[in-house]
């Protein structure tokens, strides 16, 4: 079946989104055209502005339309001297939602992966090293993902911190709240056992 070239182009464009295959893209395209053209126009305008105006924070490398993001420019976020290292800007949103962290961040935009040719400079570790040297940082919290690459990246950064006399800590990994032990994989259970703590009364 031959469809409109513009419709085909729209469906192909929608497929750039994660988890969106041909059928999902087709459904989205038809929904926008049939039922929500005003929503489609708002989406197009928001995408155009975001793609052209959003860049990276000069300090932490997260997404922002300013030179320095709101977190990095907030004096209160600098008081405790903590920097939390994450792989993605999305990780910042996840941590901020907990309300348990009041320091600053550094976004790697990935992780070390020698097999893929991704080295320290490719994920901004040269910039992180500059901050370790120039700023009054007391602790680096390593919140990379609990994958082989994430662990390797965390270990590399921990060694970097040691060179500058900065404490490095790793976020805990373990059994999720509400989870059942028989459903937890061996690696997660091993981390849980290794990271156990005393119960005091």
Swiss-Prot record:
Chain ranges of zinc fingers (C4-type): 57-72
A molecular function GO annotation: DNA binding
Superkingdom of the organism of origin: Bacteria
Disulfide bond positions: none
SUPFAM superfamilies, per the entry: Recombination protein RecR
Signal peptide per UniProt: none
Keywords linked to the UniProt accession: DNA damage, DNA recombination, DNA repair, Metal-binding, Zinc, Zinc-finger
GO-annotated biological processes: DNA recombination; DNA repair
A Pfam family reported for this protein in Swiss-Prot or TrEMBL: RecR_ZnF
InterPro entries, sorted: DNA_Rcmb_RecR, Rcmb_RecR, Rcmb_RecR_Znf, TOPRIM_dom, TOPRIM_RecR
Domain Toprim: 81-176
Family designation: Belongs to the RecR family.
Biological role stated in the UniProt entry: May play a role in DNA repair. It seems to be involved in an RecBC-independent recombinational process of DNA repair. It may act with RecF and RecO.
NCBIfam families according to UniProt: recR
Name this polypeptide is given: Recombination protein RecR
Organism: Klebsiella pneumoniae subsp. pneumoniae (strain ATCC 700721 / MGH 78578)
Record gene name: recR
């Amino acid at each position: 079946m031959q469809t409109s070239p513009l419709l085909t182009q729209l469906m192909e464009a929608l497929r750039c989104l994660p988890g969106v295959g041909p059928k999902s893209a087709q459904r989205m395209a038809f929904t926008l055209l049939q039922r929500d053209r005003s929503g489609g126009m708002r989406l197009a305008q928001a995408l155009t502005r975001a793609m052209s105006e959003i860049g990276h924070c000069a300090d932490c490398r997260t997404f922002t339309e300013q030179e320095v993001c709101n977190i990095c420019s907030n004096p209160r976020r600098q008081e405790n001297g903590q920097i939390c290292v994450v792989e993605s800007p999305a990780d910042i949103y996840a941590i901020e939602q907990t309300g348990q962290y009041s320091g600053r961040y550094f976004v790697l935009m990935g992780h070390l992966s020698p097999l893929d040719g991704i080295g320290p400079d490719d994920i901004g570790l040269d910039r992180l090293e500059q901050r370790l040297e120039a700023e009054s940082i007391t602790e680096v919290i390593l919140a990379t993902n609990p994958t082989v690459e994430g662990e390797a990246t965390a270990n590399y950064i921990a060694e970097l911190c040691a060179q500058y006399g900065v404490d490095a800590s790793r976020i805990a990994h373990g059994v999720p709240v509400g989870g059942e032990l028989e459903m937890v994989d061996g690696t997660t259970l091993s981390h849980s056992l290794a990271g156990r703590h005393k119960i005091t009364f």
